[in-house]
Regions:
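A structural signal for short hydrophobic beta-strand segments in well-ordered beta-sheet cores
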Residues: 53-57, 114
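Intrinsically disordered, Lys/Arg-rich N-terminal extensions and targeting peptides
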Residues: 1-31, 36, 144-160
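Short, contiguous, helix-prone interaction/anchoring segments in small proteins
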Residues: 30-48
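Helix-adjacent hinge/juxtasegments
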Residues: 56-98
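Short, surface-exposed beta-strand-loop junctions and turns on beta-sheet-rich folds
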Residues: 41-42, 49, 56, 69-72, ...
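Beta-rich strand-turn-strand
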Residues: 89-126, 130-132
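C-terminal end-helix/capping segment
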Residues: 83, 90-96, 130-160
Length: 160
């Protein structure tokens, strides 16, 4: 019998690339996601979109809103509303701390990525501060400069 291959502990389902473009991520927090019915099967099939989602704190609970989980193809009657608010699982002390920072300092909670960790669905939530237009321009200029330097270094060692 052949030896079994170890599966990786984490498998990324979706990332919110727009969040890193629109916000400065000050801190990241791993939370669990409360899902119902066939939503996990839909996530395994890759049917999720984090692009326009955000995290709210209501009644001492973290809720992710605007996250679209596609209905499972074979779910029929048991499928949930694709845009429903889903509860995130975190310690009360963490929720209180995040609530204070959002309320007093004007930060925002944004989902950064969704992944499986040892068979459980986890979400990385970022405590973020919005970028201004000039910050985005500076990031783009820095990225272009890095690309041109890498290109020059790579082409320097080639023969003509």
């Amino acid at each position: 019998m052949a030896p079994t291959k170890e599966r990786p502990a984490t498998k990324t389902i979706a990332t919110n690339r727009e969040a890193r473009h629109e916000y400065f991520v000050l801190e990241a927090l791993e939370t669990g996601v409360e899902l119902k019915g066939t939503e996990v099967k839909s996530l395994r099939a890759g049917g999720v979109n984090l692009k326009d989602s955000w995290v709210d704190i209501e009644n001492g609970e973290l809720l992710v809103k605007g996250m679209h989980i596609s209905p499972y193809d074979h779910g029929n009657l048991f499928n949930q509303d694709p845009m429903r608010a889903r509860r995130l699982l975190a310690h009360k002390s963490e929720i209180r701390r995040l609530h204070q920072q959002c309320k007093l300092q004007g930060y925002t909670l944004v989902p950064l990525s969704l992944y499986f960790k040892h068979g459980r669905v986890k979400m990385e939530v970022g405590l973020c501060k919005g970028k201004k237009l000039y910050d985005k321009r500076a990031d783009a200029a820095q990225r272009d400069a890095k690309r041109s330097i890498d290109r020059a270094v790579k082409s320097n060692g080639k023969y003509y």
